[in-house]
Amino acid sequence: MAKTSTQPVGGWLFKEEPEHYSFTDLERDGDTIWDGVTNNLALKNLREVRSGDKVLFYQTGKDKAVVGEMLVTSDPRSDEKEKDAKLVVVDVRASKRWPRPVTLAEIKADPEFANWDLVKNSRLSVMRVSAKQWQRLVKLSQANP
C-alpha cells in the first residue's frame, strides 16, 4: 500500500523545458510519469515526494515561470527504462493552470524568496516549496503584473 503524504512543506516544484514537455501537454495527457531527473540533490528530493503531494510546474527555457499545479499520484519508484537503479520516477496529474504565470524575475524581486533554491540553486530541478512560499506564489499568480 502506498504511503500517504507526510509533506511538512507547502509542496514541491518540478522544472521542465516546455519544448520537451509543457503544462499544455500535461493538461492534454491528464497524467504522466515524471522522469529524467539525474542530479543527486534533485533525486534525493524526488525520493521524498509522496502520493498526494502538491507540485508547482515550472517551465524553464526562454519564459521561465511557474505556470500551474500538479498532484503526485504515486510514491517514488525505480525508473524501469534506466539501468541505473538510483534513478526514480513519480506519476503526476495536472491540477490547474494558474491565472497567469509567475516569472522568475518576479520571484527574484520578492524578498520572500531570497533564500529559496529556485533563486540560489538555479540548476536544481526538484525542490521544496514552503507553505508560506506557496501562498505567496498563488497571490502573485492572481495579481495584475
Residue ranges and their predicted role:
Residues 56-57, 71:
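Hydrophobic beta-strand signal
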Residues 1-51, 144-145:
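Compositionally biased, charged N-terminal/linker segments
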Residues 58-64:
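Short, charged beta-turn/beta-strand-edge "cap" motif at the junction between a beta-strand
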Residues 10, 30, 51-53, 66-68, ...:
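A generic structural signal for short beta-strands and their flanking turns/coil linkers
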